[in-house]
Amino acid sequence: MGSFDLILLLKTAPGLSLALLLAAMGGLTSERSGIINIALEGKMLISCCVTALMSVAFGPWIGLLGGIGAAVVLAMLHAVLTQMYRVDHIVSGMAINIIAFGASNFLDKKFTDINRTGEIPQLPFEFYYVAAFALPLVLWLYLRRTKGGLRLWAVGNDPDKARQMGVDPVKVRYLALLATGVFCGLAGAWLVTNAGRFVDGMTAGRGFIALAALILGGWRPIPAALACIAFGLLDSIQLQLQGSKLLGAGIPSQFWNSLPYLATLIALAGLLGRNRAPAGLGKP
């Protein structure tokens, strides 16, 4: 590519934002309930792997359900660790990620069909676009306009006061993590659908970027979605700059690859302390 293509940028950015958007909404749901969730990466990755495996064996719809199911299983394990056994949220999140990395690596080596380009049956891209870009508005309406959303908000802000009002924080958090598993499952399924194959480690830190996006958005659905879209734009820009003979000449590709992540770190550093986390985040 010899020059910067604005039309191509606008075409590719939504697809690059989509997995982040789904994962960020999942992370926001659980963090709004008071659970620190650094396990988005692992839930996405296991969904990528299981979606690919089951799509090859049984077709794309079963693959999608399998990927969501695998992410939900890890989400429920996360719930048991944090709510039943009171394991530290950071430690349990890291444990979930390690389990997902190990399981996906094993399955990738055991079933080699899933990493061949074009072997994985795909659902229409429109399905994922509609699901992802409608979700922030739906989640905003849920949090602000429904009893369930207000309970979620209350538990995340003050679990003790929520108990006094007759709300069970443990039940709310289980349901929140269930939703997180579904959203991360969709995110992982999209990555595999978009790539047409499974590659070990293909989430490439997107779960952590999604976590950063929801923090940048102040734990609010619409601003968090905008942060995801901004990251998708940066990712699309760096891909074009890598291929540009004029702008990318002589500059290592690793530099361009790091730009979206560097921009995220700078944005987080600039907003550190300004965005208020849910007051009950990390509390039993």
State each model region's role:
Residues 125-199, 221-226:
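Helix-loop-helix "hairpin" substructures at the membrane interface of multi-pass membrane proteins
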Residues 8-58, 64, 69, 73-90, ...:
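Single transmembrane alpha-helix segments in multi-pass membrane proteins
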Residues 32-36, 74-125, 147, 204-205, ...:
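Short loop segments and helix-boundary regions at transmembrane helix junctions
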Residues 23-24, 48-52, 101-105, 129-141, ...:
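Hydrophobic core segments of alpha-helical transmembrane domains in multi-pass membrane transport
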Residues 198-261:
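Transmembrane alpha-helical segments in multi-pass inner-membrane proteins
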Residues 138-143, 157-171, 241-284:
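Cytosolic-side transmembrane-helix boundaries in multi-pass membrane proteins
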Residues 28-29, 53, 57, 73-76, ...:
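Membrane-interface helix caps of multi-pass small-molecule transporters
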Residues 89, 93, 100-149, 198-200, ...:
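Transmembrane helix-bundle core of multi-pass membrane transporters
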